[in-house]
Amino acid sequence: EKMALDYIQQILEQEGINSKIYESAPGRGNLLACLPASFHMDEGAGPDRDSAEDEAADRPLILMSHIDVVLAKESQWKHPPFAAVEEDGYIYGRGTVDTKQLTVMELAAFLALAENGEYRKRDVFLLVTCDEESGSACGLSAFLEETIPAGSRPITGRELFENSEVISEGGGFPILVGDTAFYLCESGQKGCGTVEFTVAARLAKGPFFGSGDGMVRAMKLVADIGSMELEQRKLPTVAHFEQRLSQCVDGGSHGEPDAGQDAARLGEVLSPVMNNILTAMNRNTMTVTMIQGKNSSEVKVICDVRLLPGYGTEYLKELTDSLAEKWDADCRILSFSEGYESQPEGGLIGCLEEATRMELGEAGKRAELLPFISMGSSDGRFLVPMKAKVYGYSPVLPWDMTFDQAVSM
């Protein structure tokens, strides 16, 4: 990681841009560079400024990506996964779509912004982190506690992100509906957690004289979880997602939205994968992922929990306490990070929409940006307390996220 950060720092230095690598562990760290606004609020208004621009000027724009990647088994790859082999217009390698490609895209945009000398109404930061794939203890989590220079006084990384707008990983892959390529933009994430139920035998213990009631109750708990339908909520992002795709299916009709009709139409034209994503964006889920039976006296049931933005720890505790009481079990919330939803229309995302139409549209085909709620989890989860608006967008041409990970040149 440090070698990659050093390389990025050299590129920035060649363009006269200062940056700093905040070392979080030997050979690991996070790089930050800044292009300051062309003016500051106390210096008066810039050209043609209005109240909306005044509000935006208070919020920095942060281009964020991570330089680390997950492991790769070379025998499963067509080309060595860390060789960045170029073949037939593609670059093959681990990280080409998660997220070295985003690092390159954001670095290029950052350099272009510095070179063209255009008026900037706010500070723009480039942040390249490490350790995202392993929990971010040495990455963004560590950076948030760093002290960084900012004008007249130093601030923490946490303060830097307060009320900021962030472009990070997530989305960018297109789905085709009619003659339109919709490039998905992650404007939110579901909350992610892990819950552990422990069901102990109530009656005689031991394999010879035991009643097996602990295991029986554990299996009933599993069946109960599997048949539950948790609360649902239609988020603004999801309503916009369904309505826009339905309009495209209907040939551009802009009539009154009907959620039931929208869902039915989309079910017919979307792929099975996209239908699953759409279903998940509309509901909370709890899924049993592991059953552990040390002995006949105790069974553990491990569950993955995905909650829509707006459902937090309090809702999760009420849900798990109810199940634990029903089946006479103990329950622990092992981990939980709250979800979030950023504004799905206007502002920064409006700028991304315009750029998508201009840069990715082709003859006979339209390109549009379409916000969605992700079921996965990334560094955006750390920014919920700071009320940052986080958008995951790294648009790519044809790509492959499996073994032989590759991105079009």
Predicted regions and their residues:
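Acidic/His- and Gly-rich active-site-bordering loop/insert found
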Residues: 1-94, 103, 113-122, 303
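Fold-independent oxyanion-binding glycine-rich loops
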Residues: 25, 65-67, 88, 130, ...
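Short, internal active-site loops enriched in acidic
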Residues: 27, 38, 130-134, 172, ...
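Conserved hydrophobic/aromatic beta-strand scaffold that supports enzyme active sites
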Residues: 30-34, 166, 196, 290
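Metal-dependent amide/peptide-bond hydrolase catalytic core
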Residues: 46-51, 172-181, 186-188, 192-409
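Glycine-rich phosphate-binding loop signature in dinucleotide/nucleotide-binding domains
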Residues: 56, 158-162, 363
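Structural motif
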Residues: 60-62, 90, 164-166, 389-390
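Acidic/histidine-rich catalytic neighborhood of metal-dependent amide-processing enzymes
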Residues: 91, 97-186
